[in-house]
Amino acid sequence: MEDRQALEEAGEEMGFPVVNISGGGRGRRGNYSNDGSGARELSLRVNEEVTEPPYNSITYAEVLRLYRQNGFSFFLSNLHFEQIKYFEHREGEGDLGAIIREHGKIVLDPNVVYHLRRPLKIQSLCYIVGRGAVIKVHASVGQQAVHVYRQLDISPRIMGMLNVTFLECKFHWADDEGVNFERLARHFTLFFLTYESVFFACDFVGFPGLTLRSTCLLRVEGCTFTSCAVGIHHADVADLKVKACYFNHCSVCIFADGPADVLRNCATNCDCFVIMEQEGSVVGNSVVYKLPPSRADDLMICQQGYMYPLSSIHIVRNLSCEYPKLKNNVFSHVDMHVGLRQGLQHFNQCNLSFVYCMLETESVPKVSFYSSYIQTLTVAQIVQFSREHSRECQCFCGGRHRLLFPSVVHITPTVVPDRTRFTVDVEELSDDE
């Protein structure tokens, strides 16, 4: 009884509403009787206006203490992001992982360069505001720099802090002497995400291997990827959302092995912009130029026993999925690969300039360029694979395979619509906004 009373008093000091739902015992307003007055009093208590803690008034450590004492009380209270005190972390103030576990809401100093030399494990909800601070990830960190996961009931759910969030952080790769870079690059992962995460306005510069590897719901918005081997690798039934990001000099920007929405991004001088293995949408993107031949790698992808050279926009063969939605994109000086799927593949209001599109044989009647803005387009159909000409290439699965070069025939006149027969003054080519 004394412990419960102490807990209620501590909750009142923090500003949490304390409700006695037992109908008896001692609450904040005295004793309740069993004649029904307790139920009436409870109804009045629930409907009255609750006084919430003011801005920046509660430390995350205090919230954890109360949560561990009585986790059920958090179902009866409203706790928001702005009420949590932020902790200003400066270099040399302790281990970052321990600080995240203790404080949750952390603000970095933009005038300090932070260094990550040991693997970091994030196992609770957190919100990290970088304010443009640079975090250098050293090669000595090993094959996995940051592992994000959440243990059950280790932290409460706070409105506005429902995910692991990184805001305005700049992650830079730093080589270390004595580290086998080639071996590390094949297996390196900057972020291994197994809990819902958000990256907002972050920079990633020069990372080998996988920059963001996710097996859960992931949102990447307003971020920049520069000289990264693979920007985003998503493999889960949960959705991936990549919005308003910029990719420059990356080998592979987005590999979506699950539902994905790729919206209003820009990619320049990248070998592959997106690999779509499941359904999704690619809307409002601008993809210009591939990597120059001197810097490009011979990349390929294997799927269901088929092996193809990797293209800038690669729609993987998948008989159980429909084609992704492509609309309002600008593709210039790139190539595309369209595999066999269900339904039809339309390039609605897409600008195709100096584009080479390679179609698998079965997918030829399923592709339509009727609603596209065709500047310079070459369409080729794969007829067979030549056994006389082959090359060993690096596959996206991590191994190396011998790729047989496809033999193609150009079918551009048969798939490009005859504009003398079809007018452009139609709804499919008009602006619907």
Curated annotation (Swiss-Prot):
Keyword list, A-Z: Early protein, Host cytoplasm, Host nucleus, Host-virus interaction, Modulation of host cell apoptosis by virus
Superkingdom of the source species: Viruses
Chain segments annotated as coiled-coil in the UniProt record: none
Family as reported in the entry's similarity comment: Belongs to the adenoviridae E1B 55 kDa protein family.
Binding partners and assembly: Interacts with host PML-4 and PML-5; this interaction promotes efficient subnuclear targeting of E1B-55K to PML nuclear bodies. Interacts with E4-ORF3 protein. Interacts with E4-ORF6 protein.
Subcellular location as annotated: Host nucleus; Host cytoplasm
Domain characteristics, as noted in the entry: Contains a PML interaction motif that allows the subnuclear PML localization.
Function: Plays a major role to prevent cellular inhibition of viral genome replication. Assembles an SCF-like E3 ubiquitin ligase complex based on the cellular proteins ELOB, ELOC, CUL5 and RBX1, in cooperation with viral E4orf6. This viral RING-type ligase ubiquitinates cellular substrates and targets them to proteasomal degradation: TP53/p53, LIG4, MRE11-RAD50-NBS1 (MRN) complex, ITGA3, DAXX and BLM. E1B-55K probably acts as the substrate-specific adapter of the SCF-like E3 ubiquitin ligase complex.
Cited InterPro entries: Adeno_E1B_55kDa (IPR002612), Pectin_lyase_fold/virulence (IPR011050)
Name of this chain's protein: E1B 55 kDa protein
Gene Ontology molecular function: any one: ubiquitin-like ligase-substrate adaptor activity
Record GO biological process: symbiont-mediated perturbation of host apoptosis; symbiont-mediated perturbation of host ubiquitin-like protein modification
